[in-house]
Amino acid sequence: MEDLYPSRQNNQPKILKRKDPVIYTDRSKDNQAPITKEQLDSYEKNGFLQIKNFFSEDEVIDMQKAIFELQDSIKDVASDKVIREPESNDIRSIFHVHQDDNYFQDVANDKRILDIVRHLLGSDVYVHQSRINYKPGFKGKEFDWHSDFETWHVEDGMPRMRAISVSIALSDNYSFNGPLMLIPGSHNYFVSCVGETPDNNYKESLKKQKLGVPDEESLRELTRIGGGISVPTGKAGSVTLFESNTMHGSTSNITPYPRNNLFMVYNSVKNRLVEPFSGGEKRPEYIAVREKQPVYSAVN
């Protein structure tokens, strides 16, 4: 298969134009979408969309309870699915929750989310990756700028830009508690990064990403084109959907206010993983689902 988005192959970074649609369902069918035309326009232009108060207060309480019960149950468990902060033993992320936990399986199968995702991707979908992210007050560490698609393409073999990340806020998101930051319009440009991917790179990158991180000049250019940086803020229960190639990152959290979220990545069934474009070993199933792929269709 031709590599349309080569990265980590040269000693100089390069910005390539996107070769894929942003919204896969024809825009003539906007009236059939579960979101408004204005929301579709915003997603297509910016590469992300925040929907505030998506989940009710009761649903948020249930999800908050579930993420902390799971965290407490495995705090002393040694598991590759549990990622801990690089300078402590605090849990940073728990992966593969959509298949390992019945409650989060139900959340992944929420019709309200699936209707939007299926419309944007123009097909049935499956969960490529799921995780809970914990960013406690005073301790939560930063995560450098990156495009998820760059990693999924190079290390997992995701062929095209036909996936969407859904971040469910389970804490109030402020502009100061290590929030998600996104560069508007960056999904239209692929930053081909420098470096060579070693086997098992994920063991380090999930704690602190060093490869697949864009250079400063490319980031300056993306922010110039996009007109700056956006920070979705809002109450717990808000949902932010962002396109697989949207450049994003977050700062450390030095405030008393935690920022926790449930993160689901939906990939089109027409965009299933092939061999990693790095030529290296496949990442584990709990990071990049290949084998067990329950398909979320309009029928079920």
From Swiss-Prot:
Q: Which InterPro entries match?
A: EctD, Phytyl_CoA_dOase-like
The record, for SUPFAM superfamilies, names: Clavaminate synthase-like
Q: What does the record say about activity regulation?
A: Stimulated by FeSO(4) up to a concentration of 1 mM, whereas higher concentrations inhibited the ectoine hydroxylase. Also inhibited by ascorbate.
Give induction info. Induced under high salinity stress and stationary growth phase. Increased ectoine biosynthesis occurs as soon as the cells start to grow in high osmolality medium, but there is no immediate 5-hydroxyectoine production. Appreciable amounts of 5-hydroxyectoine are made only when cell growth slowed and the culture enters in stationary growth phase.
An annotated Gene Ontology molecular function: 2-oxoglutarate-dependent dioxygenase activity
Provide the cofactor note recorded for this chain's UniProt entry: Binds 1 Fe(2+) ion.
Which transformation does this protein catalyse, written as a reaction? Answer: L-ectoine + 2-oxoglutarate + O2 = 5-hydroxyectoine + succinate + CO2
One of the GO biological process terms: ectoine catabolic process
Query: Could you confirm whether the keyword Transcription appears in this record?
Result: no
Binding-site positions, 2-oxoglutarate: K135
Q: What is its EC number?
A: 1.14.11.55
- Which residues make up the annotated site Important for ectoine stabilization? W152
The protein's assembly and partners: Homodimer.
Q: Which family does it belong to?
A: Belongs to the PhyH family. EctD subfamily.
Task of the protein: Involved in the biosynthesis of 5-hydroxyectoine, called compatible solute, which helps organisms to survive extreme osmotic stress by acting as a highly soluble organic osmolyte. Catalyzes the 2-oxoglutarate-dependent selective hydroxylation of L-ectoine to yield (4S,5S)-5-hydroxyectoine.
This protein's name = Ectoine dioxygenase
Q: Lineage of this protein's species?
A: Bacteria, Bacillati, Bacillota, Bacilli, Bacillales
